[in-house]
Amino acid sequence: MCSRGVGRTTEQGIRIGRAGERERIRGRVRAVIGQLEGILRDLKEVAKELKEVVEQIDRLTSDFEFELDTDDWTPGTVSSTSSSEKGGPLCDLGPLDFLSSDSWEFCSFLEASTPSDSGDGSDRPPDFRLLNGGVTPNGPDSSSEEIPIAQQKPPPSKNSGSRDRVRFSDKVLYHALCCDDSEDPPYGQETPRDPPRATAPCAVMKSKPGGLTGVRKGTRNCSTQTVCDKSTQTVLPYVPKKGKDKL
């Protein structure tokens, strides 16, 4: 019996604890709801104050006239009104109704609408003498103070008939006979050209009783000669030994 009574009391205590927790949660929720209601009331009061401020601004600005004529419109007013109205219809602006402040068409319109500075209205062409670096005026009374143009002197012309003589010296002849590339000939002197080589006659080679074996160009074996010797000496015809004995 005692155990049953103890079990009942514990169950009742648990129920009471759960009920207390629920009451606490409900109290917190009610408090939050009350705070939200207070915030909504404050917002409503702020909205009323804003309406009153707007009405006062309308009363103060009712005496001002903000309507402008079409001639007074500028690109700034056009852009401001278009941004404020968010794409609303604009009034008739004449030639500016299709232009914007950042378009090339507006720039061309301004260039076409600007009047010319000259009184007669005729466009004077630019002075090409100033552009090409000609005589530059130095003020309003600079007719006498003009910068002279530097005249270019023509280069001295040489006579076609006259020709410099080439004087040959021992040094030039030495260079003609011996190749020495370390030293260049002096300025104004020309090295003599190689004399034309004599054409060597063709020697006919005879063979045993059979006839001609072939035609051979007679040249002298000059394997020990230098390049300069070959260029300066004439080529001697080749004569076989039999021919030398007969001579």
Swiss-Prot record:
Family annotation (InterPro entries): Largen/INSYN1
Keywords for this protein: Coiled coil, Synapse
Origin superkingdom: Eukaryota
Cellular component terms (Gene Ontology): postsynaptic density
Biased composition (Polar residues): 76-85
Subcellular location: Postsynaptic density
Segments for region (Disordered): 69-90, 112-166, 180-217
First-listed, main subcellular location of the protein, grouped into a coarse class: other
One Pfam family recorded for the sequence: DUF4589
Gene Ontology biological process: inhibitory postsynaptic potential
Coiled coil: 30-65
Family, as annotated: Belongs to the INSYN1 family.
The name this protein goes by in its record: Inhibitory synaptic factor 1
Species annotation: Xenopus laevis
